[in-house]
């Protein structure tokens, strides 16, 4: 089997080089903007991560959206600019909004998926992370839901504005075609 330009091969099939490069650029952009955070309660609220979750979901699909969220969380933790709470929120939000967008092709559904995935499901999954991995026995089950909701609503709103502009100017479809 020959390797075509723009593709890499692994034991499961092909990985698209363009998607990998775009995902890496999204990670770099997200990490470089990690200084923009809003402390709310016990969590670092980071709207840029949620904005990039939505953008990665729309452009890259579920696998690369989740990988982008994971790699961003790892790098931010290594740099000391993130916390372990970033993993459940960002990855679940990226997965849910990407799966919903993949099935429906509706942007509004993607936005709702990010808010539910990060704000509610990710907020609830942050509780065992805080309790078991961070040793914080004082947190309650719903401690992280409100801060995560605030953060994801802000990031999703920014993404909706950017994607809306790209959609109206036909840039969205053009960029999607370039990545495929």
Predicted stretch roles:
Residues 1-180:
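Loop-helix junctions at membrane interfaces
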